[in-house]
């Protein structure tokens, strides 16, 4: 339903500068929050889940920014008012950069909760993100196609690092009570108690 609202209907979100907001909501906030609720049956972990959901949404929106960055002239020619058409490449290039930085800042309470070792994850992500952003600033047209994949891979790297940080460093009771319904010894044998 939301995919249809994104591109079709009487007021397609992607044609009116709302595509990025829709991606943050429907590729980040909604799926992460409801997946957590479905797996745990509770909203108790919201202080970590809400920032995580927004971070995932921001990183997913960066894929859309690269796509719209590439297609700016074509979109403008057919009156498709993406954020890149509205604000320009320079501004949206900055938004791309800051989306990744803000996403990592949103994760600081969780990284701090997990352990100092888990801080490797956002540092590695930021290095990848800044490298991709530098390429974005220098590229136009078809040169941006590989950056779509790199931006998506950056999101995947973030998600995998977050997963491993949680698996390796969550206290046993958190894994059992909130994430794995007391099946942590079967589902999550690496959930090592932290004293």
Language model features: what each stretch is:
Residues 1-43:
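Intramembrane alpha-helical segments
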Residues 31-53, 105-118, 163-182:
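Helix-coil boundary and interhelical linker segments in multi-pass alpha-helical membrane proteins
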Residues 177-195:
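Transit-peptide-like, low-complexity N-terminal presequences
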Residues 1-4, 44-66:
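Membrane-embedded alpha-helical segments that form the functional core of polytopic membrane enzymes
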Residues 21-25, 49-54, 93-97, 119-121:
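Hydrophobic alpha-helical transmembrane segments
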Residues 1-8, 47, 97-143:
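Transmembrane helix-loop-helix
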Residues 57-101:
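Solvent-exposed interhelical
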Residues 21-36, 56, 84-89, 149-162:
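Small-residue-rich segments of transmembrane alpha-helices in multi-pass membrane proteins
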């Amino acid at each position: 339903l939301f995919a249809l609202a994104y591109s079709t209907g009487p007021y397609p979100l992607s044609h009116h500068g709302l595509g990025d907001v829709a991606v943050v909501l429907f590729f980040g906030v909604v799926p992460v929050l409801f997946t957590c609720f479905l797996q745990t049956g509770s909203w108790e972990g919201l202080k970590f889940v809400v920032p995580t959901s927004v971070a995932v949404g921001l990183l997913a929106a960066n894929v859309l920014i690269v796509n719209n960055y590439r297609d700016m002239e074509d979109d403008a020619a057919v009156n498709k008012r993406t954020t890149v058409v509205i604000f320009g490449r320079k501004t949206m290039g900055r938004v791309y950069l800051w989306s990744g930085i803000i996403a990592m800042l949103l994760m600081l309470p969780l990284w701090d909760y997990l352990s100092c070792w888990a801080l490797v994850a956002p540092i590695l992500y930021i290095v990848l993100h800044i490298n991709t952003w530098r390429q974005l600033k220098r590229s136009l047209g078809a040169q941006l196609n590989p950056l779509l994949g790199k931006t998506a891979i950056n999101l995947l790297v973030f998600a995998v690092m977050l997963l491993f940080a949680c698996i390796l460093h969550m206290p046993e009771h958190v894994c059992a009570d909130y994430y794995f319904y007391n099946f942590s010894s079967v589902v999550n044998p690496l959930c090592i108690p932290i004293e």
